[in-house]
Swiss-Prot record:
Coiled coil: none annotated. It comes from Streptococcus mutans serotype c (strain ATCC 700610 / UA159). The chain crosses the membrane at residues 18-38, 75-95, 112-132, 166-188, 203-223. It is found in: Cell membrane. Disulfide bonds: none annotated. This is ATP synthase subunit a. F-type ATPases have 2 components, CF(1) - the catalytic core - and CF(0) - the membrane proton channel. CF(1) has five subunits: alpha(3), beta(3), gamma(1), delta(1), epsilon(1). CF(0) has three main subunits: a(1), b(2) and c(9-12). The alpha and beta chains form an alternating ring which encloses part of the gamma chain. CF(1) is attached to CF(0) by a central stalk formed by the gamma and epsilon chains, while a peripheral stalk is formed by the delta and b chains. Key component of the proton channel; it plays a direct role in the translocation of protons across the membrane. Pfam families: ATP-synt_A. GO terms for cellular component: plasma membrane; proton-transporting ATP synthase complex. The gene is atpB. PANTHER family: ATP SYNTHASE SUBUNIT A, CHLOROPLASTIC. Keywords: ATP synthesis, Cell membrane, CF(0), Hydrogen ion transport, Ion transport, Membrane, Transmembrane, Transmembrane helix, Transport. Belongs to the ATPase A chain family. GO terms for molecular function: proton-transporting ATP synthase activity, rotational mechanism.
Amino acid sequence: MEKTINPTVKFLGIEFDLTILMMSLLVVLIAFLFVFWTSRHLKIKPTGRQNVLEWIYDFVLGIIKPNLGSYTKNYSLFAFCLFLFVFVANNIGLLTKIQVKDYNLWTSPTANFAVDFGLSLMVAVICHFEGIRKHGLKTYLKDYLEPTAAMLPMNLLEELTNIISLSLRLYGNIYAGEVVMALLVQFADFSPYATPIAFLLNMAWIGFSIFISGIQAYVFVLLTTTYIGKKVNIDTKGN
């Protein structure tokens, strides 16, 4: 498979991936424009595009409610925005491929492990912050000693593995999808007879990838709210 690289720039000694930065900003813009377009002229009885927006919001509520319980409304907008971002980020790389010489200029941000790890770290920070905010530092830290103080190392290890597994699950699925699609595109170059076969296979793979991308956005939000729910519902664990 032909090797391409993403253009980078250094700032204050830190190397930034320009393709990932621009694609991430584009994902945010697309998600914002979608919400802006579907939320214009809201009516009590929704019709048309407002139905689409409310259906997605209700779908996200259905994901998070079992995990957050009475705190569902507190985090519903965060979960909604997170779902939109991850879903669009997962799928944007399927639209096209832009390559200038050896530089790749178009990709799914979530096909980059740094992005997924960053999202997972953000989730971890929110979880700890909300746990401390809801219950105070003493009660929050005491929970790491449950059910016994001997479980402290395992509880700390669980926090680390949550971050790693959340990021690796998303990265592995999206990156693998882009690799397979790139291989199918290169298959079309073998001969003129391979082009229609590669096209059909690529269309089928894109459809399957969209489905997988939706599942991964669902799982990411589900696990995120599961982790948050465990932190904010400390006082209900024993009930």
